[in-house]
Amino acid sequence: MQTVLIALLRFYKLAVSPLLGSRCRFYPSCSDYAREAIQYHGAARGTYLAARRLCRCHPFSAGGVDLVPPPNSDARNAPHEAEASSHRL
């Protein structure tokens, strides 16, 4: 399944993306993020992470660097942990 999804992403990047132009507000681009997420996390979780990323990529988003979370991290708790550690004295 991973191979099929990555092949579809490669097709999009080579055939469709050049026609639309560069519109992604993030680094890496959404298609590169999706490929990395699928490679690191597998088809199911990688697709979920890619879908969340696509929902964040819109004209009102600030964009910036948004890397795929490491395979052993729980991305849902990461912002809360960072926020809690910044409030400690």
UniProtKB/Swiss-Prot annotation:
Region (Disordered): 68-89
Family annotation (SMART domains): Haemolytic
Compartments it resides in: Cell inner membrane
Name of one Pfam family that matches: YidD
UniProt name for this protein: Putative membrane protein insertion efficiency factor
Similarity-based family: Belongs to the UPF0161 family.
Predominant location: membrane
